[in-house]
Amino acid sequence: MRHRRRTPHLNKPADQRKALMRALTTALLREGRITTTKARAKAIRATTEKMITLAKEGSLAARRQALAYIYDKELVRSLFEQAPERYRDRPGGYTRILRTVHRRGDGAEMAVIELV
C-alpha cells in the first residue's frame, strides 16, 4: 500500500524519476523560470525549496548535499553566493507555479514554475 506517500511517480521508474527531478531542479535554478507539466512542477517545488534553504544555511555540509543533487558545480557556487542575500527575509515559498494553456499534442496541463 502506498498510503501517505508524498512523491508522485510521474509514470516513471525510480531511477528515471530521480534523474528527471535533478535535471528539472537544476534547470529551474539556472534559468529562474521553466515551463513543464503541472505535475512535474509540483513535484520539483519541494526539492528546489530544499536546495535554496541549504544555500541559505551556507555550511560546508549543506554545500556538499547540494553538490550531490544539482548537476552543475558552478551553479551550486553561484546559488550559495546569491541565495542568502536574495531570500534573507523570506522563510520559505521561494517558488511560484502559474498554470498555462494545455499542451496541444496530448492535452496535458502545463505550468510555469519560477523563482520568486
Curated annotation (Swiss-Prot):
GO terms for biological process: translation. PROSITE patterns: RIBOSOMAL_L17. GO terms for cellular component: cytosolic large ribosomal subunit. It comes from the Bacteria. Keywords: Ribonucleoprotein, Ribosomal protein. InterPro entries: Ribosomal_bL17, Ribosomal_bL17_CS, Ribosomal_bL17_sf. SUPFAM superfamilies: Prokaryotic ribosomal protein L17. GO terms for molecular function: structural constituent of ribosome. Coiled coil: none annotated. The keyword Ribosomal protein applies. Part of the 50S ribosomal subunit. Contacts protein L32. HAMAP family: Ribosomal_bL17. Belongs to the bacterial ribosomal protein bL17 family. This is Large ribosomal subunit protein bL17. It comes from Synechococcus sp. (strain JA-2-3B'a(2-13)). The gene is rplQ.
